[in-house]
């Protein structure tokens, strides 16, 4: 069983720069057809300072943590039994190419179902920009199958 004493545990914050080339690649890979995601002139015409961050791109940047497996390692979770359970995004402000975003992760909850056959770890991540403005809150649920 996962140790519930880790609920509330925070990981070291880390920062990542939003790069234009990666935004364009992500927009193309996810089928974004609005030119504001790939053409800087179109973005400026639309009133943006630069290319806007497409939906869900923050998950990619979150994976740039110095140790993306830190929470799983901390809890001793076996990779062979992990499933991606759920993911959600709450946006508070837009982010753009050139921004430096800071990610602060915390274990928000640990619980089980089916008599412990399934254990769930809820991670919440606050994302803020270089002006310390809250950009988004990410919620990820990882499921561990036991037995």
Where do the language-model regions lie?
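HotDog/MaoC-like acyl-thioester-processing domains
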Residues: 1-2, 91-147
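Hot-dog-fold acyl-thioester-processing enzymes
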Residues: 1-84
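Short alpha-helix capping/helix-loop boundary micro-motifs
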Residues: 86-90
């Amino acid at each position: 069983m996962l140790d519930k004493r880790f609920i509330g545990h925070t990981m070291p914050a880390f920062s990542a720069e939003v790069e234009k080339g990666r935004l364009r690649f992500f927009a193309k890979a996810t089928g974004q057809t609005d030119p504001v995601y790939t053409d800087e002139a179109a973005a400026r015409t639309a009133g943006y300072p630069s290319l806007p961050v497409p939906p869900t791109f923050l998950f990619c940047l979150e994976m740039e943590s110095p140790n993306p497996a830190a929470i799983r390692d901390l809890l001793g979770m076996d990779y062979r039994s992990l499933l991606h359970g759920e993911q959600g995004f709450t946006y508070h402000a837009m982010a753009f190419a050139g921004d430096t975003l800071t990610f602060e992760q915390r274990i928000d909850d640990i619980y089980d179902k089916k008599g412990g056959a399934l254990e769930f770890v809820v991670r919440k991540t606050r994302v803020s920009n270089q002006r310390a403005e809250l950009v988004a809150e990410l919620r990820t649920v990882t499921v561990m199958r036991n037995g």
